[in-house]
Amino acid sequence: MNPVLLFILSASVATGALSAAPDGRRSGAASADGAAAPSVAATARTIDFSGLTWNVKSSGSEAWGPGPNRFSDAASNVWVDDAGRLHLAITYDNGVWKSAEVIAQRSFGYGTYRFTIDSPVDGLDPNVVLGLFTWNDDPAFNHREIDIEFSRWGNPLDATNAQYTVQPYTSSANLTRWTLQPGYSASSHSWRWSSRSVAFQSSAFGNQIKQWSYTRRAGIPKPGGENPRINLWLFRGAAPQNGLPVEVIIGRFEFAP
């Protein structure tokens, strides 16, 4: 494998589904009835982003987790610009709020997963969640879900707006909340996953702004079919509190073994 796989975008299309924990605080999860929603539809739109092919999740007229939300594969919700950057948007269409998710077709296992965000995310509406994560429909090891998420989970008074998690989040030792300060027009967020730890790090303008390591060996998932995913969705499916559509730009995704 090339020591560094660099992903910068371009367009095509596909479908996938995850679902939410009971209160919706997961970027990926089982469906509301406890069953896993399909990760890729039979006729999936795909995009090319950062050197990878990604499925674009579409729930059609149904609400899927996380949230649950209506996920759209429309070009107004997911697109790649001329500079190769991925745009995810939450839009309001015919009385329905529609969210966005992309799912890489490759699985990488242990290594460093790095996401570069090319837009501010400190001031997202309290009901909006941006998730950078791994997931596998197989429920073993809590779906092998590792998350970096930006959200206030519906609470506009929450001073924190970001978190690192090795699922399940219901164990306080598996999660740390923190605050991404205003003023970062771009930022980079990563985790290094090994059999010994999951080491998270965030930086902006060349400076580290947060780091945290999860070292509980029994809780570290083993690799097995998980893939990187990015989503922009509404907590518990609730409309943005400010009533406005949302857009986030992902500059690139990188993996290094």
Where are the regions that the model predicts?
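Positively charged n-region of N-terminal signal peptides that target proteins for export
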Residues: 1-5
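Short hydrophobic/aromatic-rich beta-strand segments that constitute the beta-sheet cores
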Residues: 88, 198-202
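Beta-strand-rich interaction surfaces with strong enrichment in secreted/lumenal proteins
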Residues: 99-106, 174-180, 217-218
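Low-complexity, Ser/Thr/Pro/Gly-rich disordered linker/stalk regions
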Residues: 22-130, 134-140, 144-154, 164-166, ...
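Short, solvent-exposed beta-strand-to-loop segments that form ligand-recognition rims
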Residues: 204-227
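Localized edge beta-strand/strand-to-loop motifs within extracellular or lumenal beta-rich domains
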Residues: 183-199
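Bacterial N-terminal signal peptides
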Residues: 6-16
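Short, aromatic/His-centered strand-loop micro-motif at the edge of beta-sheets
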Residues: 165-186
